[in-house]
């Protein structure tokens, strides 16, 4: 916020972009390279201007006091997630500095406190793996890989969540003109359908409440023991609303948080930059006396300006996500084009009324295949039981079913791949 002044050329371009976009091979930053990888990027031994949210937590991980202030910090080391995870998980000497080791152990202890606090509160903790494109030394795609969130990533996530909640609470208390990250509860219609589905998997909708995130968390814990857990996670996720930016705090259902905003990434998200501006403006005017009337008028005016911007930031976030997914699909097409005519053993990862999503072995590459491709029968999707049912033969197709597909066509420009169905494998 110190370098990106309101209404400057850099600010207008950042507002237009709304967010940085991350492709498998490169990123398109929201801010110019000189800022995103230069003046605003931490480097060991170099002073950097920062905005600090310093929190005091009790033994239960609850924030009992905090202070937000402008600061100057000097990073002691550049650490990477894998090295820190190796040290935290197995005690490997991937981190040689003893002082840093001591700090990481303390941070790990704090992470567990924060995790337990959010668990008690009812925060919903999905367990999805994240797919990433693998490359060779010539930057050519060799396949896909799946990884679950590492301990080091979980640690940073918990710290960011705590900072975001604390700053959101502060902005509401001080009536600052900021954007909030709001996640509404699921709609009644989606809850009704979800209850019907869960009833087939041993969850009695009459004994478990879905009116709050704590109920969702309890259900998720129950479903972990089932072989269909991965698919049921998707069902739960799809029943929930999308998180959006708004000018008023509305809480975050998934995190079971009463207050929530985005504060921790002002380099790559415009809403975070706006929050930083509001905080810096408050800090600079803290010693200036202003009438409550003037402050209230200014706040109302700010809300009128920001409401349209909040909608735009939400839309730009969706656009970035869509672009990232399409870029991965494009790379999959380029990768598979030389394999036209090849048979692939595949496994169904998810399904719905229009298509099955299969994972092609051995590349861990997923693609959507239309139901019409399964030409041995005419299949219908049972939304409550989560399987496909063949009208003529009565075959039931569930997630985890293996099949053989032949790659017959790849259109790189249209990002489209077609298969022929060769038969079921089990």
For each predicted feature, which ranges?
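C-terminal structured domains
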Residues: 390-398
């Amino acid at each position: 916020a110190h370098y990106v002044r309101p209404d400057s050329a850099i600010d207008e371009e950042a507002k237009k972009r709304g967010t940085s976009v991350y492709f498998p091979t490169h990123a398109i930053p929201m801010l110019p390279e000189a800022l995103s990888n230069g003046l605003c990027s931490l480097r060991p031994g170099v002073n950097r201007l920062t905005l600090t949210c310093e929190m005091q937590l009790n033994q239960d991980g609850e924030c009992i006091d905090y202070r937000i202030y402008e600061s100057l910090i000097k990073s002691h080391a550049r650490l990477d997630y894998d090295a820190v995870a190796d040290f935290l998980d197995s005690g490997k000497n991937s981190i040689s500095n003893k002082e840093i080791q001591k700090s990481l152990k303390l941070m790990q202890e704090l992470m567990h406190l924060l995790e337990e606090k959010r668990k008690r509160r009812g925060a919903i903790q999905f367990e999805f793996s994240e797919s990433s494109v693998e490359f060779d030394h010539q930057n050519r795609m060799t396949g896909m890989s799946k990884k679950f969130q590492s301990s080091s990533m979980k640690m940073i996530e918990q710290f960011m969540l705590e900072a975001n909640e604390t700053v959101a609470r502060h902005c509401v208390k001080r009536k600052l003109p900021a954007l909030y990250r709001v996640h509404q509860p699921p709609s009644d219609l989606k809850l009704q359908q979800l209850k019907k589905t869960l009833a087939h998997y041993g969850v009695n909708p009459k004994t478990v409440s879905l009116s709050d995130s704590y109920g969702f968390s309890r259900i998720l814990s129950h479903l972990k023991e089932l072989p269909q857990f991965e698919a049921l996670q998707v069902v739960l996720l799809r029943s929930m609303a999308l998180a959006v930016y708004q000018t008023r705090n509305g809480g975050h259902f998934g995190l079971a948080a009463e207050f929530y905003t985005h504060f921790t990434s002002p380099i790559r998200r415009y809403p975070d930059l706006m929050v930083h501006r509001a905080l810096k403006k408050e800090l600079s005017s803290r010693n200036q006396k202003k009438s409550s009337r003037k402050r209230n008028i200014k706040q109302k005016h700010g809300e009128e300006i920001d409401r349209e911007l909040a909608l735009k930031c939400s839309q730009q976030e969706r656009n970035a996500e869509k672009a990232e997914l399409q870029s991965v699909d494009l790379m999959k097409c380029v990768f598979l084009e030389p394999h036209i005519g090849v048979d692939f053993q595949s496994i169904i990862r998810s399904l719905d009324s229009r298509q099955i999503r299969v994972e092609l072995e051995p590349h861990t590459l997923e693609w959507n295949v239309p139901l019409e491709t399964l030409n041995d029968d005419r299949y219908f999707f049972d939304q409550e039981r989560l399987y496909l049912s063949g009208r003529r033969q009565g075959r039931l197709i569930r997630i985890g079913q293996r099949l053989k597909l032949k790659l017959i066509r790849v259109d790189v420009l249209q990002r489209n791949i077609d298969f022929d169905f060769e038969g079921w494998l089990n």
